[in-house]
């Protein structure tokens, strides 16, 4: 049995939906740090630990992985990764994990059709953010294949 579950997927793929369902069933989510502002309905310590950019610069040594996406920093602390069993990572974040940590993880790749993602992204972002996110995701997920299972269910 693998020790960690890692959810990976582009914007609007259902990562938070799956995370919440798994937490309801007893999984312990490792909350990431971010420098971006909270979205409507997000809560400190539940969805993210919201910190300013100076926090990331002065605390680099606490992170197991640290990535930048659309000018915002994201990272999982070593402490969270050592005691939790459910995570959301980007392909770059997954790739930056030590091999032994990746080998001990089961990666779920959420990959619904782009039109489904666009609809979901428009519900939470303005049009410019949606287009920018789609372009960034296309680059980030180009030839991504480091997963154990891929879910493409449109109703997910």
Residue ranges, per PLM feature:
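Hydrophobic anchor at the beta1->P-loop junction of P-loop NTPases
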Residues: 7
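P-loop (Walker A) phosphate-binding loop of NTP-binding proteins
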Residues: 10
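Walker A/P-loop
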Residues: 15-16
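The feature captures the helix immediately C-terminal to the Walker
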Residues: 19-20
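Post-Walker A helix-loop "phosphate-sensing" segment adjacent to the P-loop in P-loop NTPases
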Residues: 24-31
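ATP-dependent small-molecule kinase phosphotransfer cores
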Residues: 32-92
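Conserved phosphate-donor/acceptor-positioning beta-strand/loop module used by diverse small-molecule
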Residues: 86-90, 100-124
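Small-molecule kinase domains that catalyze NTP-dependent phosphoryl transfer to phosphate-bearing small molecules
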Residues: 125-156
